[in-house]
Regions:
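N-terminal leader/targeting segments and the immediately adjacent pre-domain N-terminus
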Residues: 14-101, 126-129, 215, 374-376
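Catalytic-site signature segments of enzymes, centered on catalytic residues
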Residues: 95-100, 167-244, 267
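Active-site-proximal alpha-helical segments within enzyme catalytic domains
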Residues: 114, 205-212, 267-288, 342-358
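Structured C-terminal helix/loop/strand segments within mature extracytoplasmic catalytic/sensor domains
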Residues: 336-376
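Active-site SXXK
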Residues: 37, 93, 107-132, 157, ...
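Active-site Gly/Thr loop motif
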Residues: 247-263, 267, 305-353
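Active-site-proximal loop and beta-strand segments within enzyme catalytic domains
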Residues: 23-29, 49, 53-77, 107-108, ...
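Active-site helix/loop module of the DD-peptidase/beta-lactamase fold
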Residues: 125-164, 217-264
Length: 376
């Protein structure tokens, strides 16, 4: 029995040692060498190119068209005209397919939330926060003081069930994605459930998570992400993370920008597809990069747990379950998703990462299925 255990241990250790991680240059392999039918893969790439998202290239126009109906809506952060469809397919760590300009920096909208979740994971791993702690024990400026908000935990903010009520950087919680057909007074008077009792996708509350983490780290979150994640995985120097024109916070006597968790009001992370792919590969490798653990396995497991009120959502990563299930694909797929068809898709069962920019969002499941089905 002991002899068998040693063989198994050596086998797993050898497998771990043979995993490929890109250096400054990312090695490309032929699809055939990785067990992929090149004709099927090419067909999938052609599908992505021919199903580009219809959002206007001038994303400022697209954002206003999509969200301008919201009460008091205003673009408060930077925007950028987008590029054409592009992306990469990673198999066994190697690039086996790509299309378009994968070095072009673009807005990535709510894929930013998956990066923000990772910053929360860094705080968790450093024992700066405990998931079930109440925010009132960390933030004392009034945002969590009343009876309702005082019950909110980090867990609630991370799975978007906080039901936080208030105003942040000039926008009220009720003004973000309100139900259609209601008057302004009806929107304001919507009843809130107790924290943890309902899922509501809400960028004001996501930005509250960012603000709260800024208060925990007492330094800019882009610097935290850069030092702990992006530099170790070899990301380029071109990515940026923005907040709003009015989201400056005085931290220890210094003005620091509280960054946003998406591009709903402008801002968020601007990044190229190759850096996205490195980030996705880190998660495919369960938080380890070239032998160095950057994120705990505990945190990696937490982000993939379906939330109590939405089985398709974990800690700011989407899960292939519930209403978001892609038919015929493994349930353990998880992904970051952003407005306009921005995706980082992690497929553990096939040792794959897919990054796709500006894909028609209604076609993403079909696109992923085509890639998975290209295995010989």
């Amino acid at each position: 029995m002991r002899f068998i255990f040693i063989i198994i241990f050596i086998s797993f250790s050898s497998k771990g040692q043979n995993l490929y991680f890109p250096g400054k240059l990312w090695e490309e392999k032929s699809p055939e060498s990785q067990g992929i039918d090149i004709k099927k893969l090419d067909k999938a790439i052609e599908f992505a190119i021919s199903n580009e998202n219809s959002v206007d290239k001038d994303l400022r126009i697209s954002i206003i068209k999509s969200f301008g109906r919201e009460p008091g809506y205003k673009i408060k952060g930077p925007t950028k005209k987008r590029g054409d469809s592009n992306g990469l397919i990673i198999k066994n760590g190697y690039i086996i397919g790509k299309w378009g300009d994968t070095k072009r920096v673009d807005m990535t909208f709510s894929v930013t939330k998956s990066y923000l979740s990772t910053v929360a994971g860094i705080a968790y791993d450093k024992n700066l926060i405990s998931i079930d702690d109440k925010l009132k024990d960390y933030i004392w400026d009034g945002k969590f003081d009343d009876t309702h908000n005082s019950q909110i935990t980090w867990h609630h903010l991370l799975n978007q069930s906080s039901q936080w009520s208030g105003e942040l950087f000039g926008t009220y919680d009720w003004a973000d994605r309100p139900p259609r057909g209601l008057s302004l007074e009806e929107i304001k008077k919507q009843k809130l459930l107790p924290p943890g009792q309902a899922y509501k996708y809400n960028d004001v509350r996501v930005n509250l998570l960012s603000f709260s983490l800024l208060n925990v780290f007492r330094k800019p979150l882009p610097a935290v992400l850069k030092e702990n994640i992006m530099d170790p995985i070899g990301a380029s120097s071109t990515w940026r993370w923005y907040g709003y024109e009015n989201s400056m916070v005085v931290m220890d006597g210094v003005n620091v920008q509280s960054v946003s968790g998406g591009g709903h009001f402008g801002g968020g992370i601007f990044i190229n597809s190759e850096d996205h792919a490195r980030f996705g590969l880190l998660f495919l490798r369960e938080g380890v990069w070239n032998g160095e653990r950057l994120i705990s396995s505990d945190w990696i497991n937490k982000i993939r747990v379906p939330s109590e009120n939405n089985p398709s959502y974990g800690y700011m990563w989407w899960l292939n379950r519930g209403d978001r299930y892609w038919k015929g694909l493994p349930e353990n797929i998880y992904y970051g998703s952003g407005f306009g068809g921005n995706y980082i898709i992690v497929i553990p069962d096939h040792d794959m990462v897919i990054v796709s920019r500006w894909l028609d969002s209604s076609k993403v499941g079909e696109f992923v299925k085509m890639i998975v089905d290209s295995h010989n």
